[in-house]
Amino acid sequence: RSAYDLAAIGTLGFRGEALAAIAAVSRVEVMTRQADAPFGAALVLEGGAVREREEIGCPEGTTMIVRDLFFNTPARLKFMKRDAAEGAAAYAAVQHVALSHPEISFRFLRDGREEMMTPGDGKLHSALYAVLGREVALSLLPCKGSGEELSVEGYISRPSCCRGNRSGQHFFVNGRYVKSRTMAAAMEEAYRNQKMVG
């Protein structure tokens, strides 16, 4: 309701809880190594239980492979959408995290095929290029503004590139993706007299 409320948003949820919930109903492989650690760790989990654990040599960062979602709770399978829809939702979630953290390299594979990889160079424009594609990234304009209580920074499209829907809008508050009708309406209002009609 105010700029103070925006400043108070810290995390918008704890992702670790979601990871534990996913691991409880799937088969998961995790490989991870901190920057200053000489070795990494590999875990194989099945239904939330650790089946294998070992020290390994691996690159810095974390890789998670999730397979056989709901293998141990078949009743839940009937509530899942088609594979394509579930894959699209997972892809969108990775896109949002990649855009909010350009300093981290993300790689998204579906059925063994790489669909996206960000460089992790800390530059938002590089992440935009990897996530949205060359054509879209090159058409965007940087924008930045600040007031007494808040600042806004990002990229906007030229009015000639506007879509008829909100699918290309991505809003982040303190590094977290948010869906906000208020922000979307404000963006539409700002563009109202700029859109090309026809």
Short names for language-model regions:
Residues 1-198:
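N-terminal phosphate-binding caps/lids of nucleotide- and nucleic-acid-binding domains
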